[in-house]
């Protein structure tokens, strides 16, 4: 318990596997005795607890298996599924830790032995194992095969702890009774036994031999593999030398953790308890003696993309002849096959010498080699055919058939653009200025001149002619201009058809000016579009501006809105505040009504007729004018009733013709700080209009006159 790293402790009414973190001692009432506590951490959880050393047990594989069997026998559904999953995961981690710990202990023992032997620098003697002890006590007749019905499990031993040279050493000889010496290449790949054999009707056994890659250091080192079969071993010195000279390599797959602990070969030094003994997981490779040249030897199996290897295509002949399969368990879930690993089936042994047997070619191996190669080629062709079929199924249609809307606008493109109150109309892009994000477009209409200048519009207001909203835009245009938009679409369609047929190559404007478009252009009725759509493309032909370089256009000036009216309204607002809020003109108005001050506007009102058609108000904003008039009505009710009775005039006319001018003139004089006479002249002159305001007013008069004439 003092050295245990993993224990079983009780936590939350269950036995949980845990890892020991620390050990502490606590004194009790009896000073001679101390209580030991363990600080442990539950596996697969971050929970850390403190338990007594007397309440824990050392973690063993048998305990985990017992707990797992009890969980499997439960028929009730667990109350807390998440807790149950965490408990099962902890048990699984504990089982993996125990399995990995056994493998690490074997590898560490083999590594220490290997380091000791490398320091000595001398050939190591044969290391005894349970398999060797059994082989030394058996008679020779049992080794070479007997006709007894009793079968023993083949015991395969792989050495990972000895390395020596035997190419030129005369003492490097193997006694058939003692077994083979073991050697290991520290830098070579891990080589493990591929499997065992079974006894046939004649009593002979099939031997499976393993070869390792020869490591040449200084030109005099070779590697040897040991074989323990029924407790006996055969000599393989000559074949090992051939292997070292040719540099061949046959490696076996790694072994899963499925070997019983009581198996004597499982406890042998250097044995990996990962793969069941006697199992063969890859197609056999031919004898090295059967290859006359290195190029004739079959290549290693090519690994798949997912790291696995192809399964063997044919069954082994000894198995088909009635040989019993290996009694070892099947490959477990931890089985892994390296891409460089293959297995080899050796020839059946005889009473003759082993060296003479290996020098002869094996027909079964050659036949099996050809079958494996043919099966591999057929599988390769089938996989290639399946890949091609999948590519054909995933083939996409040509990109020409798929329309992708372009992201930018270029010269000559057909677009949609909305002109004022009219719907979106087809147009042609004449020029693009990416820096200003502007484009010049020319509308497609009945009397379009390709040499005319277009309208400069923003790129954001344009839409490609084949956009997603094309049908919607067409329907909106057909509501008021069905015949006109139909002619535009037919012209564009004819242009695209001629481009596709190859009868015309050029831009849309070139097509419109060419004779090839005349049949479509002549179908338009006289002035059909001109009467409904304005002359959008009016202007002079594009010519270089005088004083500018050839071909360079005069920069387009941005037309700002007219702000003259807004400026006058802000100035008049000061006059309104002076009259209404400050009541600065009230004393002046009272003096006029009481005849204390002479008034030009009062004299004109008294001497003029009652019918006046036009009144100059000076104030342009109706809201400002309403405020001033309401204020003047209050002043008139207080003072001007007697004057109105004397004159028998209209109250509204009196306010507009007398009080309003006097109040505005008084406000101008006070705000602008001028005398009364100058303020009166400014009032009579009225607001100063800008040139653009006069032009707009004149155009409105002309439109009104034309409308009346129609």
UniProtKB/Swiss-Prot annotation:
A GO term from the CC aspect: nucleus
One Pfam family named in its UniProt record: PWP3A-B_C
Segments of skewed composition (Low complexity): 128-137, 288-297
Residues annotated with Phosphoserine modification: 161, 374-375
Note: Acts as an antigenic peptide recognized by cytolytic T-lymphocytes in a melanoma.
Functional description taken from the UniProt entry: Involved in the DNA damage response pathway by contributing to the maintenance of chromatin architecture. Recruited to the vicinity of DNA breaks by TP53BP1 and plays an accessory role to facilitate damage-induced chromatin changes and promoting chromatin relaxation. Required for efficient DNA repair and cell survival following DNA damage.
Subunit structure: Interacts with TP53BP1 (via BRCT domain); the interaction is not dependent on its phosphorylation status. Binds nucleosomes. Interacts with trimethylated 'Lys-36' of histone H3 (H3K36me3) (in vitro).
Descriptive protein name: PWWP domain-containing DNA repair factor 3A
Taxonomic path: Eukaryota, Metazoa, Chordata, Craniata, Vertebrata
Gene responsible for this protein: PWWP3A
